[in-house]
Design a protein with these regions (language model features):
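N-terminal Rossmann-like NAD(P) cofactor-binding subdomain of oxidoreductases
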Residues: 1-177, 267, 278-280, 315
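Conserved active-site and cofactor/substrate-binding residues in soluble primary-metabolism enzymes
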Residues: 9, 13, 118-125, 180-187, ...
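Alpha-helical scaffold segments in soluble metabolic enzymes
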Residues: 17, 65, 125, 129, ...
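Generic secondary-structure signature for well-ordered alpha-helical cores
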Residues: 23, 27, 132-136, 191-195, ...
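General small-molecule cofactor/ligand-binding pocket signal
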Residues: 31, 200-202, 249
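Short Gly/Pro-enriched turn/cap motifs at secondary-structure boundaries
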Residues: 177-181, 204-207, 263-267
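Oxyanion-binding "anion nests"
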Residues: 182-209, 213-215
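C-terminal active-site/capping subdomain that shapes the small-molecule cofactor and substrate pocket
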Residues: 217-319
Length: 319
């Protein structure tokens, strides 16, 4: 069977990656809207309603507008929205199959799936299991930071790193951003973990194209019961047992580090996320490493599409 796919916003960073990852798949037919008609609502509506699957790779307002073009009674066309517009909307299913035991089936049956944000993906993979198991109290004063490649900033940021000639020292240095502490991923980070309060989140962009690590520090004395890093490693290993796209790394950090370092790029060009637990009796650091353009964006979207179409969820994806 051939499925018709329309990528609305095909020329953005995520749209291009989805297009690239779907290229050559015999069961997928990409519907291509003429360049001069991309912003014509009437023409776009024709493509949306002709498709089996629509990927929305657009700003929030444009995503909402595209969803509104679905014809009344059309229950066949299914949406995967890569924007932040619908991630906490009750009528949309959150597109993280590994979230809990029932999430994959919810995605399979959904007409509208919201693809998680990249930073949020890592934070939720770490904190949702811990909060739902009662290890981390819901009112825990959570904080998190992430370092990501500049491709996560879209075309303008990519150009600032790749087309500006020789970079100055400020651009070579890792740079904190979203210092107003109101990053757009925060609502889903709270909603999908069960935390009573938004975490204090400090993202960092680095002078490398893609790859990321999201880290969450934990103080055992503030947790619901005493745990060590090895306990959390075992907990994660059990929680994510059987998950193809999430791998829990060994408790002994030496074999999984590079001379003591944890590089952000080791999962690039895959749809794999790696979970780590480091620390000692008084302090723990849990971390998730993955490709911000893979499990953090286009790979996650395609994984969900595969599930929705009843295909092997890793079809077309490297893990």
């Amino acid at each position: 069977m051939t499925y018709k796919v329309f990528i609305d916003g095909r020329h953005g960073t995520t749209g291009l990656k989805i297009d690239e990852r779907l290229a050559g798949r015999d069961e997928i037919e990409i519907l291509t809207i003429p360049e001069d008609k991309r912003k014509d609502p009437a023409v776009k509506a024709e493509y949306i309603n002709a498709a089996d699957v629509v990927f929305l790779c657009l700003p929030d307002a444009a995503s909402k507008e595209s969803v509104s073009l679905l014809a009344a009674g059309n229950t066949r066309t299914r949406f995967l929205d890569a924007s932040t517009a619908h991630r906490t909307h009750p009528d949309w299913v959150y597109g993280l199959p590994e979230l809990n035991a029932g999430q994959r089936e919810r995605i399979r049956n959904a007409q509208k799936v919201a693809v998680p944000g990249c930073h949020a993906s890592g934070f939720i993979m770490l904190m949702h299991p811990l909060v739902s198991a009662g290890i981390v109290p819901a009112d825990y004063p959570a904080s998190t930071y992430s370092i990501t490649g500049y491709s996560g900033g879209g075309k303008e940021m990519i150009a600032s790193y790749e087309e500006a000639g020789a970079l100055g020292d400020n651009m070579k240095s890792p740079r904190f951003y979203a210092l107003g502490l109101s990053h757009k991923h925060l609502p889903e980070m709270q909603a999908m973990t069960g935390l009573a309060h938004k975490p204090l989140f400090t993202p960092i962009v680095g002078n490398f194209a893609q790859g990321m690590v999201v880290a969450v520090p934990l103080l055992p004395r503030l947790l619901s019961r005493p745990v060590a890093a090895a306990d959390l490693q075992q907990f994660f290993a059990q929680y994510y047992a059987g998950q193809t796209c999430v791998q829990v790394m060994p408790a002994d950090p030496a074999p999984v580090l590079e001379n003591g370092f944890l590089p952000a790029t080791a999962c690039n060009d895959t749809n794999r996320a790696e979970i780590f637990a480091f620390g000692h009796a008084d302090q723990i650091l849990v971390a998730a490493r993955f490709d911000n353009l893979g499990k953090g964006a286009s790979g996650a979207a395609i994984q969900c599409m595969n599930i929705m179409l009843g295909l092997d969820e890793t079809t077309g994806l490297a893990v």
